[in-house]
Amino acid sequence: MRTLLPFIRLFKFAKFPLILGLVLMILGLGSSMGLLTVSGWFLAATAIAGLGTLFNFFYPSASVRGLAIGRTVMRYFEKIVTHDATFRILSKLRVQVFEKIIPLSPAVLNRYRNSDLLNRLVSDVDTLDSLYLRLLAPFFTAVFVIIAMMIGLSFINIPLALGLGLFLLILLMIIPTVFYRLGQQFGERLIQARATYRTQFLEFIQAQAELLLFNAEDKLKEKMLVTEKTWQEDQAKEAKLSGFSTALVLFLNGLLISGMLWFASNADFGTDEYHTAYIALFTFAALAAFEIIMPLGAAFLHIGQVIAAAERVTEIIEQKPLVEFNGNEEFETKVRLISAKNLNFSYPEQETLVLKNLTLDLEQGKKIAILGKTGSGKSSLLQLLVRNYDANQGELLLAEKPISAYSEETLRHQICFLTQRVHVFSDTLRQNLQFASADKISDEQMIEMLHQVGLSKLLEQEGKGLNLWLGDGGRPLSGGEQRRLGLARILLNNASILLLDEPTEGLDRETERQILRLILQHAENKTLIIVTHRLSSIEQFDKICVIDNGRLIEEGDYNSLITKENGFFKRLIERV
């Protein structure tokens, strides 16, 4: 239950609507109980008066009409107010969750599937609406109304009022506790099964081509059927327990009515000529009282799911960023732009160092190629430069200041990074290119850039031009087209430092030369750092750094490295 406390604290953001909703709920339930109770007394008193006694029926009939209208009006406005307040709280919660997700580095987010993150942000947050609407508000309403009813009826007969009130308060403690325990067993399983099924279903839709190609469609369907069967079994258990709670409450209601009828028949109501009508009043009060208890069994059966959803949302909220941007230094261009001193780095939850005592100096405005075999640590160095991670040990300087001294905004403004995997948004071609810059990019610039990177045919597809819809993950595009789209974004960006991780991977030799020529031309007055294991046009770079097993083993220009006897770079060129 402690898991729910942070979400209960969110109620302060809609304090007045929630209190107003609670008051309206109390008035609505009180009107409903009063209507049935007064009606019972009114009918019995009218029957007694029908034997010849004078009876003023105007006051009780007006009370019945007033309570009936009050019940309808209160419940109408209670629904409006409580649901509006709940939506406000859920929107605030979604914003908070999203604000917690944004600072998380890719390393943290990669622990979760995209579909699972979406499920937590949408479905699990939606499940939490029951916390106020189905659990807290009805429970506190029931407590208040039972106490108010007990006080009101005590003016007529104290023993009967106390007996009825105490019986209902005992049930109010027992029924929610029992069904909370019963529902706790499968509440978490229901939430987990829902999340798993939605993830599998999304995979099934997104990977149709691959599933058909490798004849794996039936295998995934079988997994989905197993998940669906588990989910349905738990739903069936919940439905049975919900039915049992209703049957139990109805049974207890019958016992209470029978007991109240018995005790009221033997109670002393004084010598008033309508005193026997009070028997009906207490009997109908017992009947009406179970409107309070009836929804609580099924509601607290659901609390297991609410707690499980809260735990899943809390897990995201409590994630800590691997990197925190607390600096506020201004960027000033220096000749020695990037300096690494004795850098040691290993990825989280891994002991193996991918960078070992790496020392490196890179000058402003130079074109640098970083070579090395797969897994040598080339890409890891770029990850440190954009602060997706921080080094375990050592010093990394940007413009002669610690890289941690800059704010995230300053760092992102100065550095543009092309990763090995280009993300294509489910949006138009225009919007995918606009993501390259915070400033408005004209259609003419976009079209020219698409021509330069060899994506002219995209403008001709379906005759939509820049309005071409690229779909989820850019599935209509080939791997090479996705790389070129990523390059187009880089070339539309005005950052002074360009970091490119395998920019020509997946391109043929001729296209690779054209793209490298375009990149070098664009980076004429910029600092360019390219990570690659391909040697095309390598002689055009001002500096070449060779990294192996996390260490810098050679550096220099093309001519100095190619003439170095028994050098790693020279052997590499000769082998190619």
UniProtKB/Swiss-Prot annotation:
Bilayer topology: Multi-pass membrane protein
Chain ranges of the ABC transmembrane type-1 domain: 19-308
Reaction(s) this enzyme catalyzes, per UniProt: L-cysteine(in) + ATP + H2O = L-cysteine(out) + ADP + phosphate + H(+); glutathione(in) + ATP + H2O = glutathione(out) + ADP + phosphate + H(+)
GO MF annotation list: ABC-type transporter activity; ATP binding; ATP hydrolysis activity; ATPase-coupled transmembrane transporter activity
Protein name, as recorded: Glutathione/L-cysteine transport system ATP-binding/permease protein CydC
Domain annotation ABC transporter: ranges: 338-574
Entry GO terms, CC: plasma membrane
Function: Part of the ABC transporter complex CydDC that exports the reduced low-molecular-weight thiols cysteine and glutathione to the periplasm. Export of these thiol-containing redox-active molecules may be crucial for redox homeostasis in the periplasm, permitting correct assembly of various respiratory complexes and formation of correct disulfide bonds in periplasmic and secreted proteins. CydC contains transmembrane domains (TMD), which form a pore in the inner membrane, and an ATP-binding domain (NBD), which is responsible for energy generation.
NCBIfam families reported in the protein's UniProt record: CydC, PRK11160.1
Any single Pfam family the record assigns to this protein: ABC_membrane
Chief place of localization: membrane
Compartments in which it is found: Cell inner membrane
Binding site for ATP: 372-379
CDD domains registered for this protein in UniProt: ABC_6TM_CydC (cd18585), ABCC_cytochrome_bd (cd03247)
Domain notes for this protein: In CydC the ATP-binding domain (NBD) and the transmembrane domain (TMD) are fused.
Keywords: Amino-acid transport, ATP-binding, Cell inner membrane, Cell membrane, Membrane, Nucleotide-binding, Translocase, Transmembrane, Transmembrane helix, Transport
GO biological process per UniProt: cell redox homeostasis; cysteine export across plasma membrane; glutathione transmembrane transport
The family this protein is said to belong to: Belongs to the ABC transporter superfamily. Cysteine exporter (TC 3.A.1.129.1) family.
InterPro entries: AAA+_ATPase, ABC1_TM_dom, ABC1_TM_sf, ABC_CydC/D, ABC_transporter-like_ATP-bd, ABC_transporter-like_CS, P-loop_NTPase, Type_1_exporter
Subunit-level organization: Forms a heterodimer with CydD.
PROSITE patterns for this protein: ABC_TM1F, ABC_TRANSPORTER_1, ABC_TRANSPORTER_2
